[in-house]
A protein has these predicted regions:
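Flavin (primarily FAD) binding-site architecture
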Residues: 253-268
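C-terminal catalytic lobe of FAD-dependent flavoproteins
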Residues: 272-276, 288, 296-311, 321-413
Length: 413
């Protein structure tokens, strides 16, 4: 059975890490931690029991991390699932992430505590699901004179982050002197360095992880249909391709940034709309022992610097409003912005020639249609699910919570 947690109860959340990791017998089968959580919930037990005698034909549109997770969760309940994508799995937004499986420490400052807590629980699930494609990394906040956030404030934030993780914590928060940081990062500018704070989080090995997800989907019986553009959705369970109409018991719109646009093209009313935010990253030739979280001077934004291997780091991300009809690329201005922030912290600035490559993706920020757009940096990355007869649409979400979202949608089928 697939593993997303719909909602772990208090008893399970308060159990020790060892207790939770213990494999248990459920109805004469061996269950993982997430299966135990699923079966511990009586509502889910009833839904799963009903699904065993009510197999449905399901179409999932969009093979990003949300679509793959939803398809896998549905197939694990015995449904016949076809997963359609205009290109190939993980070809768009899901391929352009910051390579982190995390609670989102910056969301604490914005007040999205529930989202952070949920994602931290799910982070543990990723470590168990793909131990060979995930790793724990320590992230350091260097603090300079004049920084928007002082080291004690940052340390307090990391402690809250660790506390929210509870028994799912992957390492302690730490307060650092300037000498500590100079030792770990000798390339940092020493003048004005006041010390900092650090915390632990999880980084994905992208290619092995997406292969693990695709393999799991196929193992559960999902039929993946690549290079198939879906032109139109219907509330009665039909979908139109370029040359035929297919009928299903349920259709799940998991088209990510294009979910709302697909509904509009299908003349299906929705109470939600999507704001599109482009996030760009650089892969830079540089060497760091651990990850850095840099405060953008004069802003409240933060930039991650994550080691990929001994010679390269991932630098990102930007946040720019994006017209979904425009090409999704990292602009020259974004490249210069990211490199400048890194260079403002280095004794020996990097030249533009150190940029090995760049990539960009568009994140869908969901909001009710009758509300005005807000600040994109503080907007929630939470998800919304909308049901219109046999059509289920999924808006928003983030990598870390995708398997949790998959379970929620599967329970609604």
């Amino acid at each position: 059975m697939y593993g997303p947690v719909l909602r772990a109860d208090r008893a399970l959340l308060s159990a020790s890490r060892e207790d939770i990791s213990t494999r248990c017998h459920v109805d004469n089968t061996i269950a993982t931690v997430h299966e135990v959580m699923l079966w511990h919930n009586p509502v889910l037990r009833r839904l799963i029991s009903e699904s065993a005698v009510s197999t449905k034909r399901i179409a999932v549109v969009g093979a990003g991390v949300n679509g793959v997770s939803i398809a896998t969760a549905c197939a694990s309940l015995g449904h016949q699932v076809q997963l359609f994508d205009e290109s190939t799995p993980f070809d768009q937004t899901s391929s352009a992430s910051s390579r982190m499986l995390h609670g989102g420490i910056r969301y604490i400052e914005q007040g999205h505590i529930g989202l952070v807590r949920e994602a931290l629980i799910e982070r543990d699930g990723w470590l168990r699901f793909a131990p060979n494609a995930t790793r724990v990394e320590r992230f350091y906040f260097p603090v300079y004179q004049g920084s928007k956030r002082g080291r004690w404030l940052l340390f307090a934030g990391t402690l809250i982050y660790q506390w929210l993780a509870g028994c799912f914590s992957v390492g302690p928060s730490q307060l650092h002197s300037s000498e500590d940081l100079k030792h770990v990062f000798p390339s940092l500018i020493p003048q004005g360095l006041c010390g900092g704070a650090s915390y632990c989080d999880v980084v994905m090995e992208y290619e092995p992880l997406i292969q693990r997800l695709v393999d799991e989907a196929r193992k559960q019986g999902v039929r993946i249909v690549e290079n198939m553009r879906i032109e139109r959705l219907y509330s009665d369970g039909r979908i139109d391709t370029a040359d035929q109409t297919l009928e299903f018991d349920r259709v799940i719109n998991a088209a990510g940034p294009w979910a709302a646009k697909l509904l509009e093209a299908s003349d299906v009313d929705s109470g939600f709309t999507i704001d599109h935010v482009r996030g760009s990253h650089l892969i830079v030739q540089a060497s760091f022992r651990h990850a850095l979280v840099l405060q953008a001077p004069g802003e409240r934004r933060i930039i991650f610097v994550i080691p990929l291997d001994p010679q390269h780091v991932l630098l990102g991300t930007t946040e720019q409003k994006h017209d979904i009809s425009d090409p999704i690329v990292c602009t020259d201005a974004e490249s210069a912005y990211l490199l400048e922030i890194l260079n403002q912290h280095l004794s020996e600035p990097l030249a533009a020639s150190a940029i090995v490559s760049s990539f960009a993706g568009v994140r869908p920020i969901v909001r009710p249609r009758d509300t005005a757009p807000g600040d994109i940096s503080s907007a929630s990355r939470d998800s919304e699910i909308e049901i219109s007869d046999r059509l289920i649409s999924v808006f928003g979400g983030k990598w870390t919570s995708a398997r949790h979202l998959g379970g929620k949608v599967a329970a609604l089928v």
